[in-house]
């Protein structure tokens, strides 16, 4: 989330006249991320303050966005801790701001933990499984837009910027994933709406108090979501939450906690167990490709902070080398 499109307090106040959320008290740009323009918004209504997030979409179109926004609404209505879109006085949850499609959603409580514990990994695994099950009856459909068709499109554009072993891996792994995605086993894997970007900075935790243990504040930033294999969503999450950041190697204890918590809610199938390593490779490749693309073919942004692509190159190399890697769970289901 970066600030590509600046918005003034006066501009946001005029836009908010279409909502029943009160008057503007503060508007602050969110510098992290690389896709959309985001602001924390504080309003006052009836003597109380309220916190929201306003998002202007820089790449996604008004035709694509209903999938994401109504998915968030659907999940929130099914008890999943996610931001809820706020409808305007006319009932619409999407309207233009500064020439871009925009929305306002509730701000979740808590903070991110970039050094997660095994307990937090288990909490995330449990809620991710519940999110997948809650999305089964979501009626809208849109594929993950950063999957194989996109890799096929952008990898040729990236190749001139990389050389040697890096270029060899980029090309060889694309060929491996083309074979995997084209297999009957891949086609049979269970699927549904997925977050597709559930990194540590997209999850909030409310800290423990004297009266309650630490608990999940929620999942947010659903704007890479799409219908995909559930195992891909798990692999994306494990590749960020359960790794040694210096080497890209998996942390067995954190991974075990996440996978077993997920499996207790939505048991993995035999086919998912067989293709765990393939999917970890796919998840690593997806983010390596997108980071290479953003790094070498950047867009202008007022507060853009591009991610280092070499991290996911290390992660991918580790997954390619890990030939004996399996799902560390009780017996999967058929």
From Swiss-Prot:
Entry annotated with the keyword Ribonucleoprotein: no
InterPro entries documented for this protein: Aminoglycoside_PTrfase, Homoserine_kinase_II, Kinase-like_dom_sf, Pseudomonas-type_ThrB
Known EC number: 2.7.1.39
GO terms for biological process, alphabetical: threonine biosynthetic process
Keywords from the named record: Amino-acid biosynthesis, ATP-binding, Kinase, Nucleotide-binding, Threonine biosynthesis, Transferase
Catalytic function, reaction form: L-homoserine + ATP = O-phospho-L-homoserine + ADP + H(+)
Keyword Nucleotide-binding belongs to the record: yes
GO molecular function, one term: homoserine kinase activity
Gene3D superfamilies assigned to the protein according to its UniProt record, in alphabetical order: 3.90.1200.10, Phosphorylase Kinase, domain 1
Pathway(s): Amino-acid biosynthesis; L-threonine biosynthesis; L-threonine from L-aspartate: step 4/5
EC main group: transferase
Similarity comment: Belongs to the pseudomonas-type ThrB family.
NCBIfam families linked: PRK05231.1, thrB_alt
HAMAP family attached to this UniProt entry: Homoser_kinase_2 (MF_00301)
This protein's name: Homoserine kinase
Species of origin: Ralstonia nicotianae (strain ATCC BAA-1114 / GMI1000) (Ralstonia solanacearum)
Organism lineage: Bacteria, Pseudomonadati, Pseudomonadota, Betaproteobacteria, Burkholderiales
């Amino acid at each position: 989330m970066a600030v590509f499109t600046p918005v003034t307090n006066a501009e946001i106040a005029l836009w908010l006249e279409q909502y029943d959320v009160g008057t503007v008290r503060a508007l602050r740009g969110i510098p992290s991320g690389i896709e959309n323009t985001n602001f924390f918004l504080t309003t006052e209504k009836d003597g109380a303050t309220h916190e929201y997030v306003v998002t202007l979409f820089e790449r996604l179109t008004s035709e694509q966005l209903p999938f994401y926004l109504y998915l968030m609404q659907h999940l929130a209505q099914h008890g999943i801790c996610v931001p809820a879109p706020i409808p305007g006085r006319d009932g619409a949850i999407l309207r233009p701001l500064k020439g871009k499609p925009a929305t306002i959603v509730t701000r979740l409580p808590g903070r991110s933990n970039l050094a997660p514990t095994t307990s937090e990994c288990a909490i995330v695994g449990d809620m991710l499984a519940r999110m997948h099950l809650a999305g089964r009856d979501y009626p809208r459909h849109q594929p993950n837009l950063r999957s194989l068709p996109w890799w096929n499109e952008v990898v040729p554009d990236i190749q001139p910027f990389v050389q040697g072993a890096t270029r060899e891996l980029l090309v060889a792994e694309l060929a491996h994933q083309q074979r995997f995605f084209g297999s009957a086993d891949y086609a049979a894997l269970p699927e549904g709406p997925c977050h597709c970007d559930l990194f540590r900075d997209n999850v909030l935790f409310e800290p423990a108090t004297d009266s309650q243990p630490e608990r999940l504040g929620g999942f947010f930033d659903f704007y890479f979501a799409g219908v995909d294999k559930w195992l891909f969503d798990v692999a994306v999450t494990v590749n960020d939450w359960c790794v040694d950041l210096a080497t890209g190697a998996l942390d067995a204890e954190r991974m075990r906690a996440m996978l077993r918590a997920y499996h207790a809610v939505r048991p993995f199938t035999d086919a998912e167990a067989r293709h765990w390593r393939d999917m970890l490779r796919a998840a690593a490749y997806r983010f390596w490709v997108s980071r290479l693309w953003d790094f070498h073919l950047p867009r202008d942004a007022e507060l853009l902070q591009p991610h280092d692509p070499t991290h996911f190159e290390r992660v991918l190399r580790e997954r390619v080398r890990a030939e004996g890697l399996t799902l560390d769970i009780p017996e999967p289901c058929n």
